Structures are given as structure tokens and as C-alpha cells.
């Protein structure tokens, strides 16, 4: 259903470092790049994530209530994604752990304040 999500940044290099590390753990890389925009995803398609300075020239800001969820293989990968996020300028919004029956997640923000979550559905 979702093709890609684009997030705003005020520091493209800093944001690229963060998403390069996160996407490497997810097994995907940059699939599109120009001087204004970077997109990460699988070469054959599927959902992707983009990063850009806002096209209107105003500073990037965080959407209240907006969150991007990244599906992990298992609880260990949720933990790794959380650690990678914090090691690359992200901030904690909720440590890894169960969030109700059959749902395990960690919450964090990227260096620009965009909220993300890494999750899996353990058996």
C-alpha cells in the first residue's frame, strides 16, 4: 500500500549518515540520489524512505502524531536498530520491549526529530 515516505531534514549529511546505518541493518541501501534528495529501499521495489530539505525552502519541522514504523525480522534486530539509531545521533522515545501481546518495538527520533519505530511481531 505505501510506496515510500519522505522526511524533512535540515542537515542532509547528518541525516544521510543516520539512514545509511539504519537501512544497512535492514538490508537495503540508497536507490536514488541527487543534490536535494536521497531515497533508500530495495532495488526491486517495495516501500522506501526518502530524505530531503523541504522544497518550500523553510526549515524542516516534525509532524506531531507522525511516525514511520520499520519492520524488523525479530527482537534482536529491533534492539540493533535502536542501538544504531542512538549511536548515529538519534534519541530515545521508548526502549525496546513488548508493547502488548504479539508486538515488540523500540521508539526513537532521527537527528531532525522525526519519530520512528522498529518493530516485530514475535510468534
Each predicted region: which residue ranges?
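N-terminal beta-strand motif that seeds the catalytic metal site of vicinal oxygen chelate
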Residues: 1-16, 68, 122-123
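Short glycine-enriched loop/turn motifs at secondary-structure junctions
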Residues: 1, 61-64, 100
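Hydrophobic pocket/interface hotspot
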Residues: 15, 19, 78, 85
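Long, continuous compositionally biased terminal/linker segments
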Residues: 41-80
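Vicinal oxygen chelate
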Residues: 26, 82-123
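Core segments of cupin and vicinal oxygen chelate
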Residues: 7-48
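Structured beta->alpha junctions
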Residues: 11, 70, 74, 97-100
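Conserved beta-strand segments that form the floor/walls of ligand-binding pockets within enzyme
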Residues: 4-6, 50, 67, 107, ...
Amino acid at each position: 500500500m505505501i510506496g515510500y515516505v519522505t522526511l524533512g531534514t535540515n542537515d542532509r549529511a547528518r541525516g544521510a549518515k543516520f539512514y545509511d546505518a539504519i537501512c544497512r541493518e535492514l538490508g537495503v541501501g540508497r536507490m536514488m540520489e541527487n543534490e536535494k534528495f536521497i531515497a533508500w529501499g530495495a532495488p526491486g521495489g517495495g516501500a522506501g524512505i526518502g530524505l530531503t530539505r523541504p522544497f518550500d525552502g523553510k526549515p524542516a519541522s516534525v509532524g506531531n502524531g507522525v511516525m514511520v514504523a520499520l519492520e524488523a525480522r525479530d527482537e534482536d534486530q529491533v534492539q540493533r536498530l535502536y542501538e544504531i539509531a542512538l549511536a548515529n545521533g538519534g534519541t530515545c522515545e521508548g526502549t525496546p520491549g513488548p508493547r502488548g501481546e504479539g508486538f515488540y518495538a523500540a521508539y526513537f527520533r532521527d537527528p531532525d526529530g522525526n519519530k520512528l519505530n522498529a518493530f516485530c511481531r514475535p510468534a
